[in-house]
């Protein structure tokens, strides 16, 4: 938010008496950390993108390398997805039979991740055949997905249906290395309880086929991330919650008004094109 916008609110008689609080969060520089013994393909990928791993990404990477279950709760746009995708890709490179299951609460989210995985597959020159497997997956494609895909993206509703047919998934379950539960803050209340039982069924089936997959949870900021992760999966977790990505300076005005309407919003627009107003 520009200084002129803040000054306008502080000085204009129409607004100044309704300002509850003004807060400025200073800019933050990125903090990086190198991961030792990266697979050469991962090293080449990062070089091709002219990218370095933030410290929280490296901590996530190292925890996954050390066979720990991880929950990462850094903010949106901090690189959570890359933090867990790269170590999973490294396992896929080094173990050609390894598989991973990504669970999303909404179809749109899984489609977004599918595009990310397809780009990684191409960039790393590996064969993982990522696919979504849900209610919209054509029956004509389901057999090939079960037999050939190394990363499958699904949702709790579809997972509930396919667990009973686990004999059709023997190849996938017997090589299952990772279970990724993204947007895990969705799983609360009755829905969360049902998904927790579903995850326990999934674990039992994976164990039946000789697999003991790692869990990777990604979430928005939570008050009790370790408790959520444990209740959802029954496992112990390593928490990564310190955001080390760069951030610009941010200004917040908490404004008390029962008539926060067109006039106030138009004042924002006249001052700058970069402000966002939240009303409730």
Question: Which sequence ranges carry the predicted segments?
Answer:
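Conserved ATPase-coupling elements of RecA-like P-loop NTPase cores
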Residues: 113-114, 161-167, 183-198
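Conserved interdomain linker/interface between the two RecA-like ATPase lobes of SF2 helicase motors
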Residues: 218, 222, 226-280
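Conserved helix-turn-beta segment of the N-terminal RecA-like "Helicase ATP-binding" lobe
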Residues: 109-134, 231-237
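Helicase-associated low-complexity/disordered flanking segments
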Residues: 1-59, 66-69, 128
């Amino acid at each position: 938010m520009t200084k002129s916008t803040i000054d306008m609110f502080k000085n204009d008689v129409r607004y100044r008496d309704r300002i509850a609080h003004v807060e400025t969060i200073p800019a933050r520089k990125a903090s990086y950390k190198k991961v030792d013994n990266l697979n050469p393909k991962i090293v080449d990928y990062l070089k091709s993108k002219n990218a370095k791993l933030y410290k929280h990404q490296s901590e996530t990477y190292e925890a996954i390398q050390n066979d720990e279950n991880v929950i990462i709760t850094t903010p949106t746009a901090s690189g959570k997805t890359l933090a867990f995708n790269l170590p999973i890709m490294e396992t896929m490179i080094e173990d050609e039979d390894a598989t991973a299951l990504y669970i999303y609460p909404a179809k749109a989210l899984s489609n977004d991740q599918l595009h990310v995985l397809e780009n990684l597959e191409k960039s790393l020159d590996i064969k993982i055949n990522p696919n979504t497997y849900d209610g919209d997956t054509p029956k004509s494609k389901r057999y090939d997905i079960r037999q050939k895909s190394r990363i499958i993206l699904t949702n709790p509703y579809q997972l509930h249906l396919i667990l009973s047919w686990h004999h059709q998934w023997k190849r996938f379950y017997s090589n299952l290395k990772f279970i990724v539960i993204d947007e895990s803050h969705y799983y609360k209340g009755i829905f969360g309880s049902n998904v927790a039982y579903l995850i326990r069924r999934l674990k039992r089936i994976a164990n039946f086929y000789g697999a003991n997959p790692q869990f990777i949870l990604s979430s928005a900021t939570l008050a009790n991330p370790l408790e959520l992760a444990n209740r959802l999966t029954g496992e112990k977790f390593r928490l990564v919650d310190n955001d080390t990505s760069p951030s610009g300076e941010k200004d917040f005005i908490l404004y008390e008004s029962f008539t926060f309407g067109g006039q106030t919003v138009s004042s924002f627009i006249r001052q700058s094109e970069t402000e966002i107003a939240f009303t409730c």
